[in-house]
Amino acid sequence: MAVRRLGILMHGVTGRMGANQHLARSIAAIRAEGGVLLANGDRVMPDPILVGRNEDKLAQLAKAHGLSRVSSNLEACLADRNDTVFFDAATTQMRPALLAKAIAAGKHVYCEKPVATNLEAAMAIVRQAKAAGIKHGVVQDKLFLPGLRKLKMLIDSGFLGRLLAVRGEFGYWVFEGDLQPAQRPSWNYRGEDGGGIILDMLCHWRYVLDNTFGSVTSVSCLGATHIPERIDEAGNRYKATADDAAYATFQLAGGVIAHFNSSWATRVRRDDLLTLHVDGTHGSAVAGLQDVVCQQRMATPKPVWNPDVKQSINFYQGWQPVPDTQSFDNGFKLQWEAFIRHVTAGTPYTWDLLEGAKGVQLVECALKSWKERRWIDVPELKV
């Protein structure tokens, strides 16, 4: 068994998502396990160099994970042929230019979503990557959540029958910054800085819908800025110029209807921060991030509408938990392992830049729907 080194430029990992999910729980965890196992018995050991503007902060982060390589010189890192993969988790506005530089330098690229703030920029990167012949991927982490994987198993088994509708509820109350500090960065609420829940979350909903229930064919969306003013990290008040809630209905191939409420201005009274209620002809299921409950046709209660008496049926009963039939690793780590195998062994990899561009396409269609107050068709996206 041979151990093969894979040099990875990790850009933008000083932020919460980059540091926690991509560095600590993915790359560092993979290294601690001895690398990624390939089909031939070899292992691939990722050797990251942390790249960013603040070398002191990068050095502290590297030390915490037993790493030594850091740099603030991106150009020099891109020129180093010993590191063949470029990863970006910095701001969306910077991403297209960074990916373009990395592809031009011959690097394979992997990045957070959204790929870009607009479809034109996203497709330009897709075309550049295709012309260069490099391997490329986009984070689509929700597909790897235990709840989503168990839900997909239910659907594929035929338990739900013909799918009818999906109702998604996502979000929580993000504090304005006065009563309590906000738990999300202030740029999320400034449109000029790439903020907005439509840009953030509809990229997720596109791949969740496409891969779980059916391809999105049209969208009707209403956005809102419910909280007009917030307080930033320095204690200064600022005007919220980005949408903090989105109410979107999707038509899917096969006739399935999906509706998602996404909000950073809602208080949670449901099973999880994200729940998907799926109805089919033979059964229904409600999935959270980790757990899924289901109800089959013969166990469905038969209520009768009578507002004059207290409801006698407890509708939370009669649902069965879907058991954990396997152990579920971190979703970001699983996708990193799949991408590393794709780069080093040529294994198939579905979640590429074109799939990421589809998310940006849906965002643009949703924003157009909101602006024009009408349904917008979502055409097939081709290179």
PLM features per residue range, with description:
Residues 83-85, 91, 96-143, 158:
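Beta-strand-loop-alpha-helix segment that lines the small-molecule cofactor/substrate pocket
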